[in-house]
Amino acid sequence: AKETAHQIGTPLTSMVGWITLLKEKHKKSIPLIEIEKDIARLNLITDRFSKVGSIPKLIPSDLTSVIKETVSYLQKRSSEHIKFKIQLPNKKIIIPLNPQLISWTLENLIKNGIDAMKGKGSLNLRLLEKASEIEILISDTGSGMKKEVANKIFKPGFTTKSRGWGLGLSLAKRIIVDFHKGKISVLKTVLGKGTSFQVLLKKAPFKNSKE
């Protein structure tokens, strides 16, 4: 994984240089701005791969901002027939987390919902602050899944013919449960109606949160 990250990193560095040159000639080009965001995201991915095996650092971060940035990025790259409904508190929610890993987890859950809706439907995300934890609910109006499938989707390599989760959700579980000491689950799923995922994160710092 680390070697792959190194190989990807070299052309990415070159792409950053070319984008910088193009921006000097087209300073207000929206496509260039979005391409730059894509490259930045690829850089984050290669950075994660280069640190495989290491324990990620958790720092006090604003979860609200992480969610806004993640949703904004995905919304611009989704079908216009996917309606996003985002409910967030009008304040910062500061908790110990790794912003990049939480963003990746949310992106994975949202993408699964978008895939399940096949280009048309509603994607709802709600952030709720409770006494000792933060709850994130992500719901879609997609195809839903059978109970036996819902019980297996967090296992490494599990997939179906219609939805290819691969390692995505198993890594999401590791990020939430092992690294952030939280919980992730399928809260509800109904065939033909949709699925709701629940993520719970601790509000207070826990042991080794700065390691």
Protein language model annotation of sequence segments:
Residues 120-132:
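Short beta-strand/loop element within the Bergerat-fold HATPase_c
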Residues 140:
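Acidic ATP/Mg2+-coordinating residue in the GHKL
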